[in-house]
């Protein structure tokens, strides 16, 4: 899998895809959706679609695709190569960088991981349609409540039969194939990650990348910078990363913080008071001050 585009810029999102097989434009196709890397504190999350003509679904099954989590890395790569060699299987994927995930989750307007996942999956299905793939059935491994997710996708694609289920990657071969594409891409992205920070003596033995992995936690503690925090390889919105920042990094006091602490929190209604102890005196306009004019309260 060629990830050179991602290696040039891994700070946002990157879409990669195979050529669309000619048969997939002519015959009705089934499409599967799955992801890899939703839980880790390190590295990107990858969403993938895989599709093939309905009459060739048995041929896809014959490749012995399975849930990527049950396969060794070498088996996943072998199966992906087999799919690449066929003339009836196509795929596409979105690589979402750790930086994109964290800034989305911590922005002024929150964009949580479920919403990001749903929108990414929807975007990939639409991408396949835009490329001319004759999609008639879609199977999706759920994120959140499957009924809600399915209703949302069905509304977006009313002419397509949509099925959303938990563990779909173990139930439907086309979703298993998508899970293999996603996992192969994520594994390669993590191995070949280009650190934009140009760090020296960087230890790349960071374990599985999952928050409960002791090796991953040790790597995070070793590579936190007291002022600037973590490299962009880290999802700084994850609780594990935030806890380490709170313990290891320097405290930051913003300009507004001091005045807020001195004044204390005020009720919002206090800003609308016209009289009383909390009312603030209003200063006159410069025009009146320069001329020694004051407001008359009585005649």
Swiss-Prot record:
Requisite cofactors: Mn(2+); Mg(2+)
Effect seen on changing residue 69 to A: Strongly reduced enzyme activity
Entry's Gene Ontology BP terms: DNA replication; DNA replication, removal of RNA primer; mismatch repair; RNA catabolic process
InterPro entries: RNase_H2_suA, RNase_HII/HIII, RNase_HII/HIII_dom, RNase_HII_hlx-loop-hlx_cap_dom, RNaseH-like_sf, RNaseH_sf
GO molecular function: metal ion binding; RNA binding; RNA nuclease activity; RNA-DNA hybrid ribonuclease activity
Residues recorded with modification N-acetylmethionine: 1
Subunit structure as annotated in this protein's UniProt entry: The RNase H2 complex is a heterotrimer composed of the catalytic subunit RNASEH2A and the non-catalytic subunits RNASEH2B and RNASEH2C.
Keyword line: Acetylation, Aicardi-Goutieres syndrome, Disease variant, Endonuclease, Hydrolase, Metal-binding, Nuclease, Nucleus, Phosphoprotein
Name of the protein this chain belongs to: Ribonuclease H2 subunit A
Domain RNase H type-2 residue range list: 28-250
NCBIfam families found in the cross-reference section: ribonuclease HII (TIGR00729)
Binding residues for a divalent metal cation: 34-35, 141
Residue positions, PTM Phosphoserine: 257, 277
A single cellular component GO annotation: ribonuclease H2 complex
PROSITE patterns cross-referenced by the UniProt entry: RNASE_H_2
Gene encoding the protein: RNASEH2A
Mutation effect (residue 240 to A): Strongly reduced enzyme activity
Illness the protein is tied to: Aicardi-Goutieres syndrome 4: A form of Aicardi-Goutieres syndrome, a genetically heterogeneous disease characterized by cerebral atrophy, leukoencephalopathy, intracranial calcifications, chronic cerebrospinal fluid (CSF) lymphocytosis, increased CSF alpha-interferon, and negative serologic investigations for common prenatal infection. Clinical features as thrombocytopenia, hepatosplenomegaly and elevated hepatic transaminases along with intermittent fever may erroneously suggest an infective process.
Family listed: Belongs to the RNase HII family. Eukaryotic subfamily.
Record-listed Phosphothreonine modification sites: 204, 216
Protein's cellular compartments: Nucleus
Catalytic activity: Endonucleolytic cleavage to 5'-phosphomonoester
Function per UniProt: Catalytic subunit of RNase HII, an endonuclease that specifically degrades the RNA of RNA:DNA hybrids. Participates in DNA replication, possibly by mediating the removal of lagging-strand Okazaki fragment RNA primers during DNA replication. Mediates the excision of single ribonucleotides from DNA:RNA duplexes.
Coiled coil start-end: none
Keyword Transmembrane: no
């Amino acid at each position: 899998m060629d990830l050179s585009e991602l290696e040039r810029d891994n700070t946002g999102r990157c879409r990669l895809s195979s050529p669309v097989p000619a048969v997939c434009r002519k015959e009705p196709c089934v499409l599967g959706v799955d992801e890899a890397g939703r839980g880790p504190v390190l590295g990107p999350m990858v969403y993938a679609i895989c599709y093939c003509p309905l009459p060739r679904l048995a041929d896809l099954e014959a490749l012995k695709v399975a849930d990527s989590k049950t396969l060794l890395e070498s088996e996943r790569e072998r199966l992906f190569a087999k799919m690449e060699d066929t003339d009836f299987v196509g795929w596409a994927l979105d690589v979402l960088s750790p930086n994109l995930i964290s800034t989305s989750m911590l922005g002024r307007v929150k964009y949580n991981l479920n919403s990001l996942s749903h929108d990414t999956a929807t975007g990939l299905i639409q991408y396949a349609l835009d490329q001319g793939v004759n999609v008639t059935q879609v199977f999706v491994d759920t994120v959140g409540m499957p009924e809600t997710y399915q209703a949302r996708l069905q509304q977006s694609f009313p002419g397509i039969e949509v099925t959303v289920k938990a563990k779909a990657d173990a139930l439907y071969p086309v979703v298993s194939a998508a899970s293999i594409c996603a996992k192969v891409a994520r594994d390669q992205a993590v191995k070949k990650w280009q650190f934009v920070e140009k760090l020296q003596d960087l230890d790349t033995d960071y374990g599985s990348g999952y928050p409960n992995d002791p090796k991953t936690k040790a790597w995070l503690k070793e590579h936190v910078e007291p002022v600037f925090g973590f490299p962009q390889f880290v999802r700084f919105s994850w609780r594990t990363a935030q806890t380490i920042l709170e313990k290891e990094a320097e405290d930051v006091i913003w300009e507004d913080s001091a005045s807020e602490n001195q004044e204390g929190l005020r009720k919002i209604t206090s800003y609308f008071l016209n009289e009383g102890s909390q009312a603030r005196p209003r200063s006159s306009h410069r025009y009146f001050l320069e001329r020694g004019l004051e407001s008359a309260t009585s005649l």
